[in-house]
Each structure stands twice: as C-alpha cells, then as structure tokens.
C-alpha cells in the first residue's frame, strides 16, 4: 500500500498520492491566469497522512505537513447547459458555462518539513 494524504482545496477533499495528477476547480486564492506550467505549489491544508503502518489525523489540519507539487496546465471543464423556460410566457433563456480547472501533479508529501514520500521515478 502506498502512502497517501487527504487534502482540502477548492472546496473539496482529495486523496492524493505522489506521482499522480489531479484536477481542482478553485485552487485556493490563486489565480489560474497568473500560474503557468511548471509553477511550484505548496498545499498546507493537509487533513490526514497515511503511511503503510501509521495514520496521522489533524484537527482540522496537520501542523507542519504540506504537499509539494507543480502545475501541469490549466484547462476548461465540460460545458454545462442551463436552460430556463417559463411556460405560457414565451420566455426562454439558454446559457452555457465552462468551469476553469487546474491540473497539478503531487511531487512529495512532507511532514514536519521532511520529505517523507517522494514520487517514484
């Protein structure tokens, strides 16, 4: 069993592992237009770190724990169509929305500023 962590970002909780990539909607307070590919990121909202033998749970977050990663690219999610119609009023409105996503890869899971679990090359 590989080491993994549970983080909170973009209003979601994600189970992350080193070497895997994830799509996040609202990346904390970071603006996706200002972040280019290969930008380094640190995520401090780590809820849990699980090793092969130990589980560390924070209340609500673990102190000294962070996730190191880098941004691969930003992209748009699939289009959602919103159609509003009022019957017998001849009022119709059709809108579409594409959510901005950021794809990032987890390089390592750190606890107490030590790299515990790194990406396997």
UniProtKB/Swiss-Prot annotation:
Natural source organism: Huperzia lucidula (Shining clubmoss)
Stated family? Belongs to the bacterial ribosomal protein bL21 family.
- Keywords attached to this entry: Chloroplast, Plastid, Ribonucleoprotein, Ribosomal protein, RNA-binding, rRNA-binding
Q: How does it assemble?
A: Part of the 50S ribosomal subunit.
Superkingdom is Eukaryota
What is one process in the GO biological process aspect for this record? translation
Stored Pfam families: Ribosomal_L21p
| Gene Ontology molecular functions | rRNA binding; structural constituent of ribosome
Q: What is this protein called?
A: Large ribosomal subunit protein bL21c
Role description: This protein binds to 23S rRNA.
Q: Name one GO cellular component term.
A: ribonucleoprotein complex
TM spans (from-to)? none
């Amino acid at each position: 069993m590989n080491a993994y962590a549970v983080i909170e970002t973009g209003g979601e909780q994600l189970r992350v592992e080193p070497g895997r990539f994830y799509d996040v909607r609202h990346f904390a307070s970071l603006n996706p237009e200002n972040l280019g590919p290969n930008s380094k990121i640190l995520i401090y909202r780590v809820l849990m770190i699980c090793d092969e033998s130990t589980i560390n749970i924070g209340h609500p977050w673990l102190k000294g724990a962070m996730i190191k990663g880098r941004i691969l690219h930003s992209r748009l999610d699939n289009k959602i169509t919103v159609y509003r119609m009022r019957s017998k009023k001849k009022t119709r409105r059709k809108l579409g929305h594409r959510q901005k996503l950021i794809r990032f890869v987890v390089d390592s899971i750190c606890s107490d500023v030590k790299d515990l679990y790194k990406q396997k090359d």
